[in-house]
């Protein structure tokens, strides 16, 4: 099953992991792994390290080997299981860095196009569903919970930075 609450109750993942990361790319809509590997464009995913609460930026050069990081980068708290890679627990990168424009700058991208999924002027408020996540993760990953509690502040600071960079001509925003 691709997506169902039955999946969530049975496996801990709203989206079927086997369906998303094996059946679709291997059988139903074959992914061109060779074309990906041969493409000179650098491809990064952002994951949140649950132990540190910090964003990590993973360069994917081989999608077969990197698919676990892709999965982790889209694993939402409470809707997905934590993804363990080399004894490190990861969740969605948006927890620690929702708009990774500063990391992109560190990689040398000084003129950027950023697509925002909300209208201009949007400000993130604390998520009302997060107390359930705090309870779920507090004992095992206190730094992750601390990051979650400040996510709206981090997101709004990233927006402020984007608007300033837009004024300077360094960022083109699509809202």
Q: Predicted regions: what is each one?
A:
Residues 1-175:
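Patatin-like phospholipase
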